[in-house]
Amino acid sequence: MSDELTPSQSHVIPEGYSLLNWHRGFGRQIGPLYEHNGPTEYRRAFLVEEHHTNGMMNARGGMIMTFADMAWGHAVSTSDSLWWVTVRMTCDFLSSARLGEWVEGSGEVVLQQDDLYTVRGRIWCGDRTIMTGTGIFKVIEQRPIAARPSLNKVSNHGG
């Protein structure tokens, strides 16, 4: 048995999304993950696949929380490309994400004090909110140019 990701994944990525180039470490274990960067907003996303699910074929709560950490924390690094760590997350589960559903998430910085950022976030499938919450993230340093996500993306639409 291999833990390599396969094109199961023969699903269609929604317009505007790019595959995140996270092919090793923890990103590989939970992926594939995607992002959409618009002029005034960003979103991260994933398709619920079997390796994300529990016995009820819903995305495990731990997967949703991990995804929230990545989606909400990204709000800290969107303009300054900063490395950050999670200090605290408070999450409210409101619904489940089922096998085969496209899950999206984003966050908004609502407070910054020194190197601490408070982010309010939401995770959803279509019109259904899966989770809301708040994260506190601590900036640890500026990312080196080679480690900045925008330079390592693989585009779905030739861009």
Regions found by a protein language model. Give the residues of each.
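Terminal targeting signals and extreme-terminal segments of soluble enzymes
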Residues: 1-159
